[in-house]
Amino acid sequence: IPQENRREFFELYDAMENELMVLDTETRQLERDMRRDTTAGDMQLESALTAIYSQKLKEGEIEMRYARELKRVLTPRQLLQLKDAERRFNRTLMRQHRRMRSANNSSPRR
């Protein structure tokens, strides 16, 4: 990323990540609330499920909106490389998480 575009890139990218994090936090809170609420009726649960399953759509909408803005500071190739880097990073994190969980489950307990 050229030096003159870095600041704008990070401002946009951080704003996008913050929006995605808020959405994820709200969705996880809704899931917890519905699990704990033993009095919730089917209508409430259906409404919550719709919101939970809609999270991916909302994430996509946020990413598309920011992709349009990021095109001002990144080339299409750079945007593609960014998406690839995000995917590889997440895959690496998941592998490490699975390895750690597997190691913890196989260690002897006292």
Roles of regions detected by a PLM:
Residues 1-73:
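Amphipathic alpha-helical segments
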Residues 10, 60-110:
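Amphipathic, charged alpha-helical segments and their helix-to-coil junctions
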